[in-house]
Amino acid sequence: MNRYINYINNIEINISSYCNKLTSNNKFIFYFYRIVTSAADWWMYLIYAILLLLITDYNKAINMIILGSLAYFFHYPIYYIIKNITKRKRPFEREENNIKCFVKPPDKYSMPSGHTSGITITILTIIHYFEGTNIFLILPILIALSRIFLGVHYPSDTIIGFLLGCTCYYIASLILT
């Protein structure tokens, strides 16, 4: 079992290091992922809520905000419990010579990715209320990639973040339906 975990860990380090080197060597990748990752910064959710109130039916906007807020209500305690149980160091801390940090991380530990889980909740809420918006599922993928390329998460951190976002959204939607 330990051998298997080491094998997976080495794959993650290699992927993270490779992506990070691409970011170091290519200004387009650097700026692209810096912009992408900011779409999941905490303050953007306030902007999304205000935009909803301005561009869509008031009742629909309120229902979306309630659904998203309930999902976040479940999300944050689980997120912090996972962070504090795993206490996984961020890639740039574990691999100081191979991986650079290109953004300021919002907290100390790596697992799970809060940017990925948060944007997943937001996008699933949008898809729930607006038909034909499945294309927006690309955003959690781009956010996840940005966190890897910018040196603050391993691939498994973003996968767990995505699953956490899906789970919290699902629980909230079950409660409200």
Q: Predicted segments — roles?
A:
Residues 57, 84-92, 151-156, 177:
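Transmembrane helix-loop junctions in multipass membrane proteins, especially transporters and channels
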